[in-house]
From Swiss-Prot:
Pathway: Phospholipid metabolism; phosphatidylglycerol biosynthesis; phosphatidylglycerol from CDP-diacylglycerol: step 2/2. One of its GO terms (biological process) is phosphatidylglycerol biosynthetic process. It catalyses: O-phospho-L-seryl-[protein] + H2O = L-seryl-[protein] + phosphate; O-phospho-L-threonyl-[protein] + H2O = L-threonyl-[protein] + phosphate; O-phospho-L-tyrosyl-[protein] + H2O = L-tyrosyl-[protein] + phosphate; a 1,2-diacyl-sn-glycero-3-phospho-(1'-sn-glycero-3'-phosphate) + H2O = a 1,2-diacyl-sn-glycero-3-phospho-(1'-sn-glycerol) + phosphate. PANTHER family: PHOSPHATIDYLGLYCEROPHOSPHATE PHOSPHATASE PTPMT1, PHOSPHATIDYLINOSITOL PHOSPHATASE. Residues 1-20 are annotated as: Disordered. The lineage of its organism: Eukaryota, Viridiplantae, Streptophyta, Embryophyta, Tracheophyta. SMART domains: DSPc (SM00195). Residues 73-220 form the Tyrosine-protein phosphatase domain. This is Phosphatidylglycerophosphate phosphatase PTPMT1. Exhibits phosphatidylglycerophosphate phosphatase activity. Involved in root growth and columella cells organization. May possess protein phosphatase activity.
Amino acid sequence: MYIKELTETDEEKRERSVEDNVDDGDKAVLVSRGNVIVLTTKRALVGVGARALFYPTLVYNVVRNKLESEFRWWDRVAEFILLGAVPFPSDVPQLKELGVCGVITLNEPYETLVPSSLYKSYCIDHLVIATRDYCFAPSMEAICQAVEFIHRNASLGKTTYVHCKAGRGRSTTIVICYLVQHKNMTPEAAYSYVRSIRPRVLLAAAQWKAVVEYYHVKVLNTQSCLTDATSALIPRNVKQVCSGNVVVFDDGSMVVVTHSDLEGYNDDDSRSRRSVKVNGNELWAAAADLSMVYRVKVVGQAAMARISCLWLGLREDQKLSGKNLSMGGISVDISVY
């Protein structure tokens, strides 16, 4: 009799992990070739509804486009950006005439009416970002990819056509994100600007949330990094010298003793040789003339201040500790002849 311990396979572990994270009745789990896809009930229901309503709403938009002059299929919202509804194969030549060299499709496969091969035959680059209709927004990664696609074409003078089914929500999300990053607009200003050109645009809550998140992550964070980089260019010692116990040195306080200042003094060797000693911050002058002592003391203080500033400059990466700066004794002999 052999007893064999049963262990879970990797697939069983994966399924059990998914089951632990899925609430009963709230999510549907699809397992295909080892890939586990978790769908919320809301997403599944919206997907079914979107499929059922695609062609009826498409016909509705076509009829309004034919009857109402203000209900345009696409609008030029920027010099190199067209925002509009899903194009038909017959629209591709006209888009090419308008200078379109790139198309961003935010439709799911069942909503796409023009294959990539047709765009390619007209030398039009095609970027597909499949996004569910109505209540959903593209991911942050997809938005960044689309914005870069538009910016790259615009820098080359090429126009990009951004579309979803009706040109209202998903495609508008991409266009607004481009405007806030490359046209220096706030989300509110960009939204109002696009609506002034294409009045029927309308963002769902998730789409507006994606715009605001993109603005904070890609725009405000970039500006913050630029501010930090600018502040980093300011040497630390500039802030340090202006604070603490450091005295700013004034070149005007320096007094230079020249030979003419010494004229008239006794040439006797016993009185002409004066010894000056500087120890720390104290300067002693062995001179009978009080004015001579004052002049030499000012020069000594000026020299001490300049040496202190030079020493602090070498320690720009260290924070001032507030300790007194100590220097060795300096002996200065001034001989008057």
